[in-house]
Amino acid sequence: MSEVSRDENMRGTSDGIGSQAQFLESELDTEFVVETFIEAIKDDDLKVVKEVVESGAIDINKDCIDELPGLHWACIKNRFSIAKFLIRRGANVNQTAGPERATALHWAARYGHVYIVDLLLKHGANPTLIDGQGLNILHFSVYSSNIMLVVYVLYFVVSNNNNVDIDSRDYNNRTPLLWAAYQGDFLTVELLLKFGATVALTDNRGFNALHCALVGGDQRAICDLILSGANFYERNNQKQDCFDLAKGMGTKALFEQALQHHGYDKLGNQKDKIFKKNSHSQLMIFLSPFALMIYTYLISLILSPPLAIALSLLVIVVTVNSLKKFVLPSLTRKNIYKVSLVRTPFFSGLFMSTFSFLLFIWVKKLYPYSVFDYTAKDAQLLITSLFTFVLFLKLVRSDPGCLKMDDSTTPVRETINQLIQIGKYDRNNFCVETLERKPLRSKYSLFSGALVARFNHYCPWVYNDIGLKNHKLFMFFAFSVQYEMFLFMWLCLEYFKKTNHIYEQVEEYAKCTFLKNETLCKGSNYDPSTFFLFIWISMNFVWLGGMLIVQCFQIFKGITSPELYALIKEERKAEALNLIPFENPIFSIPNGKNRDTVPEDPNATTVTHTISIDSLEPRNRRHAILDACFSMVGLNQWVVTFKEMLGISNLLRGNSQPRHNHSLLRNFLVANHWKTNLTDFWLNSDVTAPLWQRFFYSSDTSKAMLGGVEVDYYQLYELPAREGEPISSN
């Protein structure tokens, strides 16, 4: 057949069912029919596929082109409807094809298509078959880097008596753990280790899992393997141990950091722990800020302010580095792979030391000279301090709303099956860390090691997560601290005005070089210790004030900090791509490594775009780095909040005309009227209780108000509808 006539017939296949039937009735060569059939599968043209199969023009078990049959191509291209149709029409799900003699199940697993894998297994696909390289379904699942598929295979194949070993080897003796470590896929590494994968096994090159992780270059995977007892000194066939390999692969710094985090020196020798008990290490870290406060106070009494500041900063740096080097290695690593001072009681100790020193200065210096003139302010400071202390203790010990984990296998299988049936088996609806269905607005916390309902943020000042059950308590605490700092600053300023009368000085106080305010100048010269505390309190007052504005704005809008971060992220992507942000950006897929594949259908979700910093222009790259720094201290939230409050989101970007006529939050999924949002947050769901009790008491259950309706946040899988709208779900 000529190429021209073939092209004409090919064009005829797109003219509808009638023209296709006419095409099939004509006497065309089998190769062209097969070619048309395969192209229809690749293009997801179910009508053409059905027409070809139902006409009998092709045998679906003998339809190979490029050595792969139609079912294989449907699995490769994630054509769920076509694969389902072909299986129902009798396609052999265990047919091997291609140079490596792989089955359709192997191809579906290789590309991470969870729903196709589930379809094939439920229709008799044999998970124990291997391809020409000795790879089975578990190897291919790991290779896909789709953690959702790995979870599925581990629960429905490996642990379901299907004779697929967690340590199954390919013809190069590589286990799934070796593959995952080599790819730097820490989620898969952690999951395989949880299922009992053996760390000590090596491949034909003599590489163990830690060798592979050093090649992969993911620090969390390296840390997981170190914690699991990987051998640092084992040599591969090239006589390289982990230290040699790390040096050659450029991952030496990562390896040394991982060793340090887990109590080893740079040579891999176990360092002696200063504290044998974890509680002793935490107590030492908590008390260290008290020592710093006392030192700063004493040194300010005997040295000039500039010298006192310099020495204080030096001691702070030495103390922090000493804690990192000697005390942090003594801490038990339970839920986090990398311990930093932020995840220790250091900042809660810093808060308490500041709080204690504030009261000390007030009692020793401020109160004696304000008791008669400002009795009311002193009384308020005392009451607020007591209130703050009680709230602090309650917050440290509070439950943020952690969901209880169920480690048994059966509920996990049931949950996965349920999510697959409703088309929601993905990272947005299933937590791979706790292996349970993820309620809306919940988030996994590394600190708590659990899903936290209506998670807001981790607060180092109270050494706890802030979520459903303690968020209102946290707001009371923050307002109390802010008012206490305001009272202290006010009393300090009044005290500074009297310092030249309080302290007998022969000469008038020295002129200030930088401080032009007479009151502050008196304070810095006559009482440096109180002045230093005043400056420290003032800095915290400004920072906490900004945080309170952001928190109040979020409460006003009915969103949480992670949801605001997601909105900021999507807004930046939209700005870079000249797109409108998603109407539901909270539940977008974060990146390619954690991707989830769902069946192709008309209701498929929008693809999330990703942008690499390396691909940006130098100017934009600098902006990206600054944005990352701002996000660490919450400045990005401040900026977005003020922009939204003032309605100048587009003008601040330099655009005279907005690209889209809605604010960042207008299409937020759970946006309700501001009055509803306020009552949802400040009043618990017990409508039978008095109003004052609903306001001051947080609920100790998982139930709370959302959109004016009581919901169970532990079982929140659908959002209450906004007024005049249908119910939304994730």
From Swiss-Prot:
It catalyses: L-cysteinyl-[protein] + hexadecanoyl-CoA = S-hexadecanoyl-L-cysteinyl-[protein] + CoA. It is a multi-pass membrane protein. It is an enzyme of class 2 (transferase). InterPro entries: Ankyrin_rpt, Ankyrin_rpt-contain_sf, Palmitoyltrfase_DHHC. PROSITE patterns: ANK_REP_REGION, ANK_REPEAT, DHHC. One of its GO terms (molecular function) is protein-cysteine S-palmitoyltransferase activity. It is found in: Membrane. PANTHER family: ANK_REP_REGION DOMAIN-CONTAINING PROTEIN-RELATED (PTHR24161), PALMITOYLTRANSFERASE HIP14 (PTHR24161:SF85). This is Probable palmitoyltransferase AKR2. The gene is AKR2.
